[in-house]
């Protein structure tokens, strides 16, 4: 007969589990997913291995080629708070005529072994009272030929211009370089056809607005320029043939 003070071998019996045979279920699932993701990532990298022999520039503006800068205008614009002002509108053909004439006649000689790889619209904005506000910018590339943009718009999701106060837009259409061969004859024969078949076939029409985050009216010094990225091919024969080669 057992009493409460009697020894009972079943009382106080404990079971000890060896942890090496038991694992957390969440850990098992996470580890399986981790192995699966690692295998997929390794397969993806293996498919991209042939691309290792190619070099690309992180910033196309700093990539290979010659940058030819053409300053369009410099002026001061007053910008009111909570608004953005139109500073670039390429709907006028006279503006385009002057720009391309200067580019082709004054900038550098056009030869047959050059090609326009890209065109950048660069807007340098410097407030006359620095360290008081940040500059905002907004742009659009595609618009109908009969679209008339507003001179002033409200600020809607603009981009903050960096500390260098430079806003840069690529105007070249992707995968569509603009060869410079016979451009002089195209331009001289018919300017209207040149605009439609050469310029708008290869480049976008930009609309650019600027503003500030200031609560007061600000004066901004603008410098708007085009930077042509020129691809130069190697000549057929070396420029110098002699014992040094």
From Swiss-Prot:
Keyword tags: Viral occlusion body
Transmembrane segments: none
Pfam family of the protein (one): Polyhedrin
InterPro entries named among the record's database cross-references: Polyhedrin
A GO term for molecular function: structural molecule activity
Keyword DNA damage: no
Protein name as annotated: Polyhedrin
Protein source organism: Malacosoma neustria nuclear polyhedrosis virus (MnNPV)
